[in-house]
């Protein structure tokens, strides 16, 4: 039920975004601006229009709709890690405090369960990748946003600055950060 409620809220935000962007938070504007046509159709409730007008079986429609829905869920999860990943960063080497549960970073919040982990999703070039399994995506998100360094940048109002930081975070391999190559200014 919570997932449907979240999706309804996102659909309402999207409707408002289409009417008047000024009433929407900049983070959501950025998210909606980046949506593919298929994901936008899903948010508008036009899932029947996601498939081309070729005569395809309802089974194919169902699979394509599920793929699109999972891809949208993956994009929501990426957005959540960009906003709140720093809250889960490993900043306590002595482990003196217990790591808090962050619902926004839980795939179940977006309707992703254990059965979905091996499903491929389209993430449209994020991390230089177009398609990836949800399990692999979560691994990358954890590595980039929840490692030994926490990065908080989504509050920055200037989209150009925010995109620059995001590009720097998401286009360096985490394993290279502290190598000689990784320390060089890019």
Write out the residue ranges for each language-model feature.
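Conserved internal helical-beta-strand scaffold that buttresses enzyme catalytic cores
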Residues: 1-186
């Amino acid at each position: 039920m919570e997932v449907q409620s979240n999706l309804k809220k996102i659909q309402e935000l999207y409707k408002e975004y289409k009417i008047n962007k000024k009433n929407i938070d900049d983070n959501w504007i950025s998210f909606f601006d980046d949506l593919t046509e298929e994901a936008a159709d899903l948010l508008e409730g036009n899932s029947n229009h996601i498939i081309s007008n070729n005569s395809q079986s309802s089974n194919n429609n169902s699979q394509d709709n599920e793929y699109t829905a999972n891809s949208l869920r993956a994009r929501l999860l990426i957005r959540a890690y960009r906003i709140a990943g720093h809250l889960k960063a490993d900043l306590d080497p002595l482990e003196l405090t217990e790591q808090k549960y962050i619902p926004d970073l839980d795939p179940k919040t977006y309707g992703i369960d254990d059965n979905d982990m091996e499903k491929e999703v389209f993430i449209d070039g994020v991390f230089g990748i177009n398609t990836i399994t949800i399990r692999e995506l979560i691994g990358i998100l954890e590595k980039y946003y929840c490692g030994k360094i926490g990065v908080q940048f989504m509050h920055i109002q200037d989209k150009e600055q925010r995109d620059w930081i995001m590009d720097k975070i998401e286009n360096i391999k985490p394993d290279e950060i502290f190598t000689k190559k990784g320390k060089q200014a890019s």
